[in-house]
């Protein structure tokens, strides 16, 4: 019997709706990965509602919880760590300490960093110290880096001017440590405005993918968290980088189709769960010559 992968997901959690672990955990479980959720915050709802209640986990609790898993002899079974939104650089350093602890007992474990800073419409949404931590520390430790366009631009200190420029910038990030860069949402000048574009860059090749851009009165939150989680899960299940890339684009599109059909602000993960497991659509990644 094939072993089921185990993944430690360190990010935010909301009681109502879907963001952070609340957007990623169930879909990863649905496709066959055991997820260990470590919630860095517990809020009533995501912050785009404008008001929320809840509290942030003390940074010292992160390595303490990782050590607790070690104490029962299970830490070596962890195949990957996923991190998302950070409330502080101290929290980020605590996560990297946990990653280091896991890699000490399982050197094959992967670390996916979703370097949440913001997006093109809203700009940067994290403190400067978090941006600096992601640039100076997290990139070097990540095996997989999943920025959006704003985050790619922030890492490289300039705005991308074309698709080829995005590839060059991603390759520059690979020189700092990661094995692969997945740009979850491209927003370079001159792109096709009615398509949602993504980019996958490894040390050897690059791939570009387009899917239809769906319109919403209010853009659902948690799409990036869902994307990062599904990509990592499929890699753990044995997909190649490109297979995981194509699957993720299709599965996320299925969730958005269901969300749009329900006229919902929150991602319709439960209603779309069978389509997450078995997407009906397929988007083929095009290998780039540059």
Curated annotation (Swiss-Prot):
**GO BP term (any one):** pyridoxal 5'-phosphate salvage
- Record's InterPro entries? PM/HMP-P_kinase-1, PyrdxlKinase, Pyridoxal_kinase_PdxY, Ribokinase-like
Please give the name of this protein: Pyridoxal kinase PdxY
Is this entry keyworded Nucleotide-binding?
yes
Q: Which gene encodes it?
A: pdxY
What quaternary structure, including any partners, is listed in this protein's UniProt entry?
Homodimer.
Recorded catalytic reaction(s): these are: pyridoxal + ATP = pyridoxal 5'-phosphate + ADP + H(+)
Answer yes or no on keyword Magnesium. Answer: yes
Q: Tell me, what does this protein do in biology?
A: Pyridoxal kinase involved in the salvage pathway of pyridoxal 5'-phosphate (PLP). Catalyzes the phosphorylation of pyridoxal to PLP.
């Amino acid at each position: 019997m094939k072993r089921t992968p185990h993944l430690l997901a360190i990010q935010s959690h909301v009681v109502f709706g879907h963001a952070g672990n609340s957007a990623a955990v169930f879909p990863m479980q649905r496709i066959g990965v055991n997820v260990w959720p470590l919630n860095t915050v517990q809020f009533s709802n995501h912050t785009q509602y404008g008001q929320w209640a809840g509290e942030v986990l003390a940074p010292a609790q992160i390595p303490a919880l990782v050590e607790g898993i070690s104490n029962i002899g299970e830490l070596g079974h962890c195949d990957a760590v996923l991190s998302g939104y950070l409330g502080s650089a101290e929290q980020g350093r605590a996560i990297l300490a946990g990653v280091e602890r896991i890699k000490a007992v399982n050197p094959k474990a992967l670390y996916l960093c979703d370097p949440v800073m913001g997006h093109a419409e809203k700009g940067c949404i994290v403190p400067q110290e978090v941006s600096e931590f992601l640039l100076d520390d997290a990139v070097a430790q990540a095996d997989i880096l999943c920025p959006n366009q704003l985050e790619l631009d922030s890492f490289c200190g300039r705005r991308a001017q074309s698709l080829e420029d995005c590839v060059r910038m991603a390759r520059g990030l690979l020189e700092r440590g990661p094995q692969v860069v997945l740009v979850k949402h491209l927003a370079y000048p001159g792109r096709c405005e009615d398509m949602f574009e993504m980019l996958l860059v490894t040390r050897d090749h690059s791939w570009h993918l387009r899917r239809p851009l769906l319109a919403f009165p209010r853009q659902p939150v948690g799409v990036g968290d869902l994307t990062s989680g599904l990509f990592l899960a499929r890699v753990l299940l044995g997909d190649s980088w490109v297979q995981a890339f194509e699957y993720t684009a299709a599965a996320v599109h299925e969730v958005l189709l269901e969300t749009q059909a329900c006229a919902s602000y929150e991602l319709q993960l439960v209603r779309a769960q069978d389509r997450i497991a078995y997407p009906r659509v397929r988007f083929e990644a095009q290998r780039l010559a540059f």
